Amino acid sequence: MSGRLIGIARRDRTRAAMEVVDRGEISPGEGVRGDFRGALKPGRNKREVTVLAREDWDAAVELVGRPELEWWNRRANLLVEGMALPRTQGATIRLAGGAVLEVTGQTDPCFRMDEIVDGLQAALTPEWRGGVTTRVLAGGPIAVGDQVECGE
């Protein structure tokens, strides 16, 4: 199954504003270059890069009556569209520039989502709607518009 990368975001510290960029770099042990979370727990980080599907985000914000809410409020690193994200640990997500991500689990929505909109945490909870956490197996450049493929 393939789709397209339509958003890249990063933040340099916890609770910092998300910086949305058109291109970037993904590397093992660092995640999305410039994002603080990817570099936590070197060699043991199961959350180097987080990926969110546009269709899942749209369903969640529709449920809370805020369809205009921007995706980066979810605090994910990558936004893809046109594909269902794998829901199996060990599945891979491959980006056109050569980066390969291994799914380590679902991104559990936290209480901070309700700080944005009441009910958003619950709207993101079912069916892995909050996205997936990944570990970087291979790095590479990324850019909005890149093709993305999933494998089990």
Regions found by a protein language model. Give the residues of each.
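Metal-cofactor-dependent catalytic cores
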Residues: 1-152
